[in-house]
């Protein structure tokens, strides 16, 4: 959700640039699948180890965007976080689907159906709804905070057209909001990673 908003609204990339980044995501998926096959299937690493590796990759993705988000980030700089995200997601998906192989046969199809429903249908919609709501609420808060000095008393504001001023305010509020939300997601991800490492 945030990636596309950032790339389209802030960086101004068109559909061709966005689609070209899918090759990076595909390479992350392929490398993550090969890595998981080699170390999880052949070398028999544990679920916990694989989950920690996957969450570390996703944490790297979130931290990269938190620390590097900017108005003039080149397209090439987006390759690493997109690769890390795809790499981590495919490891999580493979590990969770493999965990279902331990379910007894009479309940296997129910378990696969529930997992597919949650991951493909319910999970993405719920995640998008929560992040969309958080984006709206935090964006309004940041727009109010950033516009505190934008009144007729400020002499600099009188020389800037209202439309340009409002557009710059909205763009800056969006940047601050995305940075704030990436920060909160990073904290949540680090907490989950710490829980996995402790247990």
Residue spans for each PLM region:
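Short amphipathic helix-loop junctions that connect adjacent transmembrane helices
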Residues: 2-18
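Hydrophobic, membrane-facing alpha-helical anchors
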Residues: 5-6, 10, 26-36, 161-168
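Hydrophobic membrane-targeting alpha-helices
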Residues: 6, 99, 133, 193-197
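Juxtamembrane loop-transmembrane helix junctions in multi-pass integral membrane proteins
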Residues: 13, 42, 73, 170-177
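Perimembrane helix-loop junctions in membrane proteins
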Residues: 13, 139-143, 196
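C-terminal module of multi-pass small-molecule transporters
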Residues: 22-149, 182-184
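Luminal/periplasmic active-site loops of membrane-embedded glycosylation enzymes
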Residues: 150-164
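Transmembrane-helix exit segments and adjacent C-terminal regions of multi-pass membrane proteins
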Residues: 161-199
